[in-house]
Amino acid sequence: NDLPAFWHEKNSLYFVDEIETLEDDHHIRRNLNLTYAIRDGIISHCGEMNQKSIQKRNEYIELKDYQYPGQYNPYTWEGCVVKMSDKIAYLARDIEDALRLNIIDEKQVEQLKKEINMISSYHFDAINNGTIVNYFILDVCQNSSLEKGICLSDEAFEVMKKMMSFNYKNIYLIDRIEVHTNYVQLILNSIFQFLYKYETIAKENQINVIEALKEDQKKYPITIQGY
């Protein structure tokens, strides 16, 4: 199909703009009608960027014109905080999840802890979500300013890069995850292509997509009923 590639920040903006509703005092469901600042924070929050400091931008941008994740910095300081938080949040959480799923073991985490303690003036007794999040929050609070933006110290940035490198090498890019990723992509792409076909059928016959699906419900009872 001719649809653009999926990326979750832009999809999230589309969802709150076009799909999500909220019930008002009269029990009528209405669009969320979010402010520009909140919508901007949603689409610009991607934390998978190698940035030590995040400065807010000063120019207004039409948010639907974003072409790729991380294209622009957020418009507000609050958005910058969210972007930095997104970067911090997944580092230790992914390590904890990988331990729970036996993707990595305690020896690997212990080695990571030793390597981090070699470059950090703060001594880590453990690598877990609470410890790591607390470390980075304190560092951001101590090093951020109007001039520098929402900022990490040089030391904390090195700790962050060390953890990101560990995660990519031992979690994200290993064969076991690649096999699972390919499996999930196959399932999601198959479901998408199946439903997208009915979007085309609905347009050609000038009917609602739901009506088009109901026409073939007996052929595909599990797929369509689940949808």
Predicted region positions:
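Active-site-proximal cofactor/substrate-binding loop regions of enzyme domains
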Residues: 1
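Histidine-centered, transition-metal-coordinating active-site segments
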Residues: 5, 10-11, 15-227
